[in-house]
């Protein structure tokens, strides 16, 4: 069975991260709630101010804390669709009001998002590169958005290491969130981090779940940051395979260009995910994503895994 459904790094984490995780033995002691060493290493990696860096149980955990602080019943949350499904779940759980904005050409956010912003808009959620479509957003539009509203703009950069996204936004109404789950290969440990505006740091730390990361997880993340070359090597291999897989898929289906570690395409047949599963390949059926039709998302795996997917797809399509 080949799993190409969850956008994981098929090469796994740095061996140094695995060793750091395994070697920690003080499991009877609670973590240090400051996570200072990890935050400083994140600062070295990103260039961000360590005093404004927070960590959480994945990007999801960070977003949950922000919603706990900021969203009151009836507050509006602007969500370009299709995008990461948890945004919808969290908005509903927080009694916020979803304002859905359909993406434009090539699934990019366009000028229509400005019409969705009102005095009640509290948060604008932007996944960049976007899950499940894989596209990156226009830097100029993001900058205009930041300057046009007082609402908090949450930039989810879970897949940024796989992209050509290079612009940096540092403003009083911007949160940038990233993860160790994708490029760093630590998905099972659920380690997210974010850069907050200064005014939000104290409220966030007061509202966050106590000890959101275990010490072994934090130590693994620190070791991963000490071996960034491992991650970059994995990303290089994944990007090369992404290009190869894209070219092969183009011969079979209409597939979207991607700046992430997955590809997104409209299925020419019904129940494609089920048919691929019968042939030993697990992909993500995106029909449940708000704003998605009969689409499939496939993770870029190792070359042999991608070949198995392509062979199974050809068999289903009768090619």
Curated annotation (Swiss-Prot):
Entry keyword annotation includes Plastid: no
InterPro entries: Aminotransferase_I/II_large, HisP_aminotrans, HistidinolP_aminotransfase, PyrdxlP-dep_Trfase, PyrdxlP-dep_Trfase_major, PyrdxlP-dep_Trfase_small
Catalysis performed (reactions): L-histidinol phosphate + 2-oxoglutarate = 3-(imidazol-4-yl)-2-oxopropyl phosphate + L-glutamate
GO molecular function: histidinol-phosphate transaminase activity; pyridoxal phosphate binding
GO BP terms: L-histidine biosynthetic process
Keyword Signal (UniProt): no
First-tier enzyme category under EC: transferase
Alphabetically ordered keywords of this record: Amino-acid biosynthesis, Aminotransferase, Histidine biosynthesis, Pyridoxal phosphate, Transferase
Cross-referenced SUPFAM superfamilies: PLP-dependent transferases
Pathway in which this enzyme or protein is active: Amino-acid biosynthesis; L-histidine biosynthesis; L-histidine from 5-phospho-alpha-D-ribose 1-diphosphate: step 7/9
UniProt xrefs under Pfam families: Aminotran_1_2
HAMAP family: HisC_aminotrans_2
PANTHER family tied to this protein: HISTIDINOL-PHOSPHATE AMINOTRANSFERASE (PTHR43643:SF6), HISTIDINOL-PHOSPHATE AMINOTRANSFERASE 2 (PTHR43643)
Name of the protein: Histidinol-phosphate aminotransferase 1
